[in-house]
Amino acid sequence: MSFSNLPPSSGRGSHADGASGRSMPPFPGSSSFTANNPSKGIHPNLTLKRSVQSFDESLDNKKPLPFSYASKVKLREKYLIVGFISSGTYGRVYKAKGRDGVGGDFAIKKFKPDKEGEKVEYTGLSQSAIREISLCTELNHPNVVRLVETILEDKCVYMVFEYTEHDLLQIIHHHTQPQRHAIPAPMVKSILFQLLNGLLYLHSQWVMHRDLKPANILVTSKGAVRIGDLGLARVFKKPLNSLFSGDKVVVTIWYRAPELLLGARHYTTAVDLWAVGCIFAELLSLRPIFKGEEAKMDSKKTVPFQRNQMLKIIEILGLPKKEKWPGLSSMPEFPQLQAMAMAPGSGHLHKPSNLEHWYHVCLKSGGYSGSSPAGSPGKEGFDLLSRLLEYDPEKRISAKEALNHPYFTTGTPVAKNCFEGFEGKYPNRRVSQDDNDIRSGSLPGTKRSGLPDDTLTSRAAKRAREM
């Protein structure tokens, strides 16, 4: 069973992927589509090349539960808490089972209250929590995590999501233990297609995710990919404030686009596509392609130039050139880039792009070939990767264009279940009975500003210890 392929784009337009409104989520259904039904709709200028079964099947033919804000519902009367999953600056996440006719498993996110000074004061929800709740309430797509309901109880806010058994960080880690073995090429293709399909939907709804990374890409036990954690997502159509003024730091450092590293005050959905390119490379190599060290803010909360991260990108892609990126010289941190290029011992930075060599070494070391069981992403895979990791955000491929790329439209059809044909088994998500404080009325307070404190470095280390 395979996904249909979207037709070639008639033009780039803006990075909103041709969004003209919020009424028609652009994802493929069966051989026909209904514009008035968002669960089966498609953008009006898209048609199908191949007839396939509806994406609705990825929801197991179950209609989404009606969303509700429940202020009088008692959490523990409706859900049985199984255990603790993870924590972040926002709060904690727990696994739960439905009670009394509410079947299935759920992930419950409990938000910490904001704090003033050292004493916890219930000053309201953080901007991040409000954004996530409001966006998840409106969004509905098979490749975006589904919010079931939001519960307010004892001054705490709980978001109840569908439960997903895996995420890409867990899957990548599994393929490095006990020894490295490649993720099969058909699985990589399916994961990437579903990720781009969900991203196309978000962008068509004028939503920028701004924190795509393996840990935030969820996968169900039936191989359906869901984009999760919309805490840094932002509606970019006619924003009240500039994107930079609202959040000065977005996207986890290893997945941060060069325009962000160079201090862009205005940016587009292209930052999400750069992150997808980084995720694509990581699925193939089983390690981050640009693994830099993050420079922290000083006491004045000044955003530093991320020199080391920029260096990691240059070592593979070469120095960005004004001739190929016309807006480069207008970037606030362009003088810092010039200083890097002219510093003593910087000769190696002036070499041409090394991405193609990196790609072929990656395929060889991973055992990817046309005759191997894992298959190979081939030259089409490299072309797509190079278009995702394009320096100039105006030239970077969009989600819509990427879905029409030959990597997806030729060769083996894209499997709707990314685990299709995979003979191995991934371990279930770790659920701990320790540190399970969802029954308490409060949590240590926090204020979320920019990215979570538990960056990928610490999170990956923590996940590795737990698995």
UniProtKB/Swiss-Prot annotation:
Q: PANTHER family annotated for this entry?
A: CELL DIVISION PROTEIN KINASE, CYCLIN-DEPENDENT KINASE 8-RELATED
Q: What is this protein identified as?
A: Serine/threonine-protein kinase SSN3
Q: Where in the cell is it found?
A: Nucleus
Keyword Chaperone assigned to the entry: answer is: no
UniProt-listed PROSITE patterns: PROTEIN_KINASE_DOM (PS50011), PROTEIN_KINASE_ST (PS00108)
Q: How does it assemble?
A: Component of the SRB8-11 complex, a regulatory module of the Mediator complex.
Q: GO molecular function of the protein, one example?
A: cyclin-dependent protein serine/threonine kinase activity
What reaction gets catalysed by this protein? L-seryl-[protein] + ATP = O-phospho-L-seryl-[protein] + ADP + H(+); L-threonyl-[protein] + ATP = O-phospho-L-threonyl-[protein] + ADP + H(+); [DNA-directed RNA polymerase] + ATP = phospho-[DNA-directed RNA polymerase] + ADP + H(+)
Q: Name the source organism.
A: Coccidioides immitis (strain RS) (Valley fever fungus)
Its keywords, alphabetically, are: Activator, ATP-binding, Kinase, Magnesium, Metal-binding, Nucleotide-binding, Nucleus, Repressor, Serine/threonine-protein kinase, Transcription, Transcription regulation, Transferase
Catalytic residues per the record? 211 (proton acceptor)
* A Pfam family of this chain: Pkinase
Q: What is the lineage of its organism?
A: Eukaryota, Fungi, Dikarya, Ascomycota, Pezizomycotina
- Superkingdom, natural source: Eukaryota
Regions of compositional bias (Polar residues) in chain numbering: 1-12, 29-39
Cofactor(s) this protein cannot do without: Mg(2+)
Q: Which residues belong to any copy of the Protein kinase domain?
A: 79-408
Q: Work out whether the entry's keyword set contains Nucleotide-binding.
A: yes
